[in-house]
Amino acid sequence: LYLIVDNTFLSPYFQNPLKFGADIVIHSGTKFLGGHNDTLAGFIVTNNEEVQEKLRFIIKTTGAGLAPFDCWLILRGIKTLGIRMERSQENAIKIANWMKKQPVVKHVYYPGLQEHPGYEIMKKQARGFGAMLTFDVDTEAHALQILESVRMIKFAESLGGVETLI
């Protein structure tokens, strides 16, 4: 039985689960690592040689390795990963604190808020809180009003690029 951690939201910049006992860590290269919404990639990381050899065999025999251009796109994104993660986190903290003051917002879920139940754990095992937050509003009508009113925020199915998404 292996402990597998999806580290997509924090990236290796903010958290390294192998240091805390994870056997396998998964990163979506499509998200923060790539950072430009222009490639499709994923990574599996382990420090277990037996698992590594099994994964290497699967990758080689199924042709699941990345093309050179996709590798270049990910490497290009990693060059700016630090500044993008820091700025995204700064913005998330500001937005979370602003949302807490809005009368229609009933709850803000963001581990960077001191009242979040995972705040202390995050401080111990990560170097940051990331940029992902969510919130509840009081009525469906207010939720629809928010969705229809946003101008700078894009509707999208992916994350980690330069756009703010809802």
What function would you assign to each model-found segment?
Residues L1-V104, Y109:
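Conserved PLP-enzyme active-site core in the AAT-like
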Residues H107-I166:
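Conserved C-terminal alpha-helix-loop-beta "cap" of PLP-dependent enzymes
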